[in-house]
């Protein structure tokens, strides 16, 4: 039987990212190549470019952020679906490209872990991501060399991870997903192997990053009161503050007090200044309470849209790093009146759920059905600037809806179709997704032509819209995408750039290794001569010293192959010395060098 192709499940997060894959029918988290950190097996969604042009992703990027803040990019997810560009070393990058670098790392780590090539992925997105943001996420996957077979809402993925071993229980689940940049609250019903999303609500600009900022601002204000110096004007100081704020937030989830200690945070006329501040959990909770209170609105809205009350909720699932904070857990428990489930890792369950959905699509998991919903209503602008809905929010997807419209003026031969997303009654108050024209309508009195407008949402939540004149059969259709969506040609170009970038990275890594080997060999050669002293004949010693000088000169240049060749030559000479002048059984350095 042919081996089934693995589909990678990816949680592409604002602050951290993770991936999982089905092994033996169970989701397994892919470990980051750098090993576990304070984030567990996930890694920071961080990309950096060093002065010599090397790209770093994940923990290595985060570690150097203090010394290189202007070339370190974090929280790019908040810019997905926008026309924002990030400029680094004179080159502009779209949010899709930066996200693709993160996805490339995930792909590479997964391939190293599994020992096989990964081509397909399921990527999770916040339930409240609009069409533009979803399309941008798919583009990022394509640039990274992945076939994104499905986009899944993050809360839905978390519920998949939770329900895998409980397929005989009927229940109502509330998924409270508070990540680095977004809050999603989802009400789901589960029974008979079917997950059905009843409603979703949230805030795309509310998350753990806001908490970090609150702590950071507090530290900066306290320091300014004590010293008169505004640290927020110093990029490096801000980066150190941001890291310290996040670290304090994480530590205070399990301890009652922590010390922020940032020596040499800045330099004043009277010398260097240090920031040393003790923060208690009580102080942290005072700082973040206004942010936590904002979580009530989406919970109320989700229950209202599902036609349910707090008493109807059977289980509460927490997702996202900030939900580890006691203040967040207590707030949710008090709001619903039930304890939260504690058997799930909030940092890993989304990736695990994505892997399960990948298993469903690959045919590895049977009898599990996922019915997702569209988070916002979709429709068109009609006469008078009114927003006419064709698909109501929280409609199960995939779905297709049609409605008949007509002309607004006599002898009108074309109509403009303005597609919108939102909940406001007037078109101008909602998000514009795109426009197109249907032309060639035969002249007729207003209201006579019949124009059928059809909205078709696929399983990824991506929208196709068509308009058809029923009298002539003429039809115009478009796939709604962001105004800044990359064209197929641009995506191809970005893929090639990504491949080129990967090759450059490999070359740079090889160059670094060759230079390091050369330095190491010089050290070994000099130490060997020093240890053996007069045992080495003068002409042999001169030969080694000459090769060392030549290798040092080459290291100062750019001819990598010459460095490699000269290193091999020096290695051979030192090995000959080892064979000729070191007694058997000796542990002199040259015997070690020969084994390098």
From Swiss-Prot:
Entry-linked SUPFAM superfamilies: Actin-like ATPase domain, Heat shock protein 70kD (HSP70), C-terminal subdomain, Heat shock protein 70kD (HSP70), peptide-binding domain
Record keywords: ATP-binding, Chaperone, Nucleotide-binding
Record carries keyword NAD: no
InterPro entries from the UniProt entry: ATPase_NBD, Chaperone_DnaK, Heat_shock_70_CS, HSP70_C_sf, HSP70_peptide-bd_sf, Hsp_70_fam
UniProt-listed Pfam families: HSP70
UniProt cross-references to PROSITE patterns, sorted A to Z: HSP70_1 (PS00297), HSP70_2 (PS00329), HSP70_3 (PS01036)
UniProt key word Ribonucleoprotein: no
GO molecular function: ATP binding; ATP-dependent protein folding chaperone; unfolded protein binding
Family: Belongs to the heat shock protein 70 family.
Role of this protein: Acts as a chaperone.
PANTHER family for the chain: HEAT SHOCK PROTEIN 70KDA (PTHR19375)
Record HAMAP family: DnaK (MF_00332)
Protein name in UniProt: Chaperone protein DnaK
Species of provenance: Methanothermobacter thermautotrophicus (strain ATCC 29096 / DSM 1053 / JCM 10044 / NBRC 100330 / Delta H) (Methanobacterium thermoautotrophicum)
Gene assigned in the entry: dnaK
